[in-house]
A protein has these predicted regions:
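N-acyltransferase acceptor-side catalytic subdomain
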Residues: 1-199
Length: 199
């Protein structure tokens, strides 16, 4: 891997096949879970009642793609992280190509939380999120869903399912069903085309 990063064409090619990387003990491991976590972008998406109250207070300014690297580093702060230097540089390279994006929660004290992920076809692959202040990552997730709906996306892939994501309507589907859905979302999308820089 040149310069210690996963080449963008390799990374996007993996996503197109339902595979994603995680770092462990200095190695890059590749995963394709038998049960895949997704958050439906239709009426099944649910905002928990307590979070609705927080949203009404508008505690953060939401920004997109203004601090991608900082969001990644925030996600890497927690113990047992799978985000190492290779992962950071690899996704920053995708971000420069317009294929990886961040959602950020800011206040007067700075960046307080957010998330990042990869966009391909009508699918968005959520990678990781973090919070420095209460509800920041949850509010970023709601902002992401709103933006994905506006842009015509139909799949939010969370990779793994957690109790936290279930509160938003997250579900698990089998690998076969997921791959069929993914191919539908990528119809007409070319990994080669997606690597062309915007004019």
């Amino acid at each position: 891997m040149e310069y210690g990063i996963i080449p963008p064409e390799v990374l996007l090619g993996a996503y197109a096949q339902g595979v994603f990387p995680m770092a462990e003990d200095g190695e890059i491991l590749w995963f394709s879970p038998t049960q895949r976590g997704i958050i439906p972008l239709d009426e099944r998406f649910h905002i928990p009642r307590g979070l609705k109250k927080a949203l009404r207070k508008k505690p953060f300014e939401i920004r997109f793609d203004t601090a991608f690297r900082e969001v990644m580093l925030g996600c890497a702060e927690r113990d047992g992280t799978w985000i190492d230097g290779v992962i950071v540089e690899s996704y920053c390279a995708l971000h420069e190509l317009g294929r990886a994006h961040s959602v950020e929660c800011w206040d007067a004290d700075g960046l307080q939380g957010g998330l990042y992920g990869v966009a391909l076809g009508k699918a968005f692959f959520g990678e990781s999120m973090f919070s420095r202040k209460t509800d920041a990552s949850k509010i970023a997730l709601v902002a992401l869903v709103e933006r994905l709906r506006e842009r015509g996306y139909e799949l939010l892939d969370t990779q793994w399912m957690t109790d936290h994501l279930r509160t938003f309507g997250g579900i698990e589907i089998g690998r076969k069903e997921y791959l069929e859905l993914l191919q539908e979302m990528l119809r007409g999308e070319s990994v080669i085309d997606s690597l062309r820089l915007p004019k």
